[in-house]
Amino acid sequence: MNVPEKLPENAFKELKEGEEYEPLMSPKSSYPEVTPWSVTWGILMAVIFSAAAAYLGLKVGQVFEAAIPIAIIAVGVSTASKRKNALGENVIIQSIGACSGAVVAGAIFTLPAIYILQAKYPEISASFLKIFIASLLGGVLGILFLIPFRKYFVKDMHGKYPFPEATATTQVLVSGAKGGGQTKKLLLAGLIGGLYDFVVATFGLWNENVTSRVVGWGTALADKTKVVFKINTGAALFGLGYIVGLRYTLIICLGSAAVWWLIVPGMSFVFHDTVLNNWDASITQTVGSMSAEEIFKYYGKSIGIGGIAMAGIIGVIKSWSIIKNAIVLASKELRGGSASAEKSEAIRTQRDISFRIIAIGSLITLLVIFLFFWFGVMNNLFYAVVGVLLVAIIAFLFTTVAANAIAIVGSNPVSGMTLMTLILASVVLVAVGLNGASGMVAALIMGGVVCTALSMAGAFVTDLKIGYWIGTTPQKQQTWKFLGTLVSAATVGGVMMLLNSTYGFASGQLAAPQANAMAAVIDPLMNGAGAPWLLYGIGALIAIILTWCRVPALAFALGMFIPLELNLPLVVGGAVNWYVTSRSSDAKVNEERGEKGTLIASGFIAGGALMGVVSALLRFAGFDFINQAWLDNPLSQGLSLIAYGALIYCLVRFTKK
């Protein structure tokens, strides 16, 4: 049966009373969806993008959304193989493959902290099995907790939420032949981005970072005033900034500037001869004798952590009515007391996994989590009960926050919510008697489960909205999402262990910023030492003020928390996005150029991140081609700027073709 080439006019508009949305694939007909082709390609996409996203996320703390590149590839391969009626299959490929970003975001923000703390506490054990099980169970829980909210977010709120990522992905899938032609451009961009980052990571052809210390006056400025400028010139980060856009990258950069160019120099000036170590006895230097990086590490980051945590709390408060309404709706359908539930079950495009199966599946998943905590993590019945209760309550409450954030801005504040989980879990576990190294591992595993659940919930609502617009069967998307979660959890566990063995998370090229923050928060709490509550409070106050001023507090707080050199390239990418989409007087031309730029940037991200994994494999195998003497030469940073300029020129040039 032929499918219309364009979405209906009411696809992005609020429906009038009695009006129904008619998707592209008619609810009255059946179409190919779950086939060996779609499942195989979905698994392949999950493996590839899990590896790429894990590398990039551990490097900079930002996980790129794989939905759009996967959709482009799905359309491209189906067009190249001349498959008919492939739209439903492409949605399944995208849905299975998109598990990559969700599982990666959940795992890498928390679980590397186990490795980080292991360096300080050798008795801590980290294994592939623990990482895999925590990621898998968190992903499964996120899917099960999100399904009861599908009808509310996807159908009832149709036209009220913009769903930016789902919109872009749907347009790619619907475009068909256009998407197939785009595949070549995506692959070319991936090749450019991949080679660019590969020659830096593997051969050190030029310096990865450019700093103001490369010149004499910059060194003097950094030593005397603690003001320093740094930027990473990688292709993947530049592409990420382009896709995020100028508004949010500017806010992130403002947060970074506030810490690095105001708070850090200000603390050095005010507390120049003071040792501030009330919460950390290992700090023995005066603030004035520290470098800018050390002041940021010991003080600035904690302000960012407080801001992220408060932004998460504000998100829960704002979403409370959504939680309540969705619970009422789900409970009515679970009891079978709703005529609309029976009607929806009969309509293919409104058919979910049975709520009874969801309830039983949720209980079984929580039981498995309890057994995992009891026998694999805590080795204590009471602690395991406390742990599973905390996981269940927090994951369920924050599910709507994650879905709501994705529906509105396409960004999931999962790191802030996980920080809250860790702080709460640490306080509760210490109160019931579980502390020290074993308490740290327990809290981090709990955080890993919750973080993956929330990340999966946010990502999955995007998939379901795509399916709603196109007309696929939600039940099939939901069922096969579990397979994607399994594959992604296994992949990210392996990549994480590889990268830790090659680089290490505590320092160096894989900073794992979120995981380092988790380790910094949990260590003092679990050892009975103080915590920088005053700094957390300052960050929380900043978040409240920003929210009151209607400025996205989470983006600003992330900027305060993530190192400067990883934030500045984001705003460079965002500025290029603005330039590309505003140069023409013709709005349609600007829109087309913006779409081309998104495609090229996606290629830079995917290629750069994938080749980063290849470079890590070479290092792990013992191949080291880096000449450190060359990287210490200022000319390596000069060459880095030239290469960076060429990369920017390439993207701008491609958008005008």
Q: Where do the PLM segments sit?
A:
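Alpha-helical multipass membrane-protein architecture
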Residues: 1-657
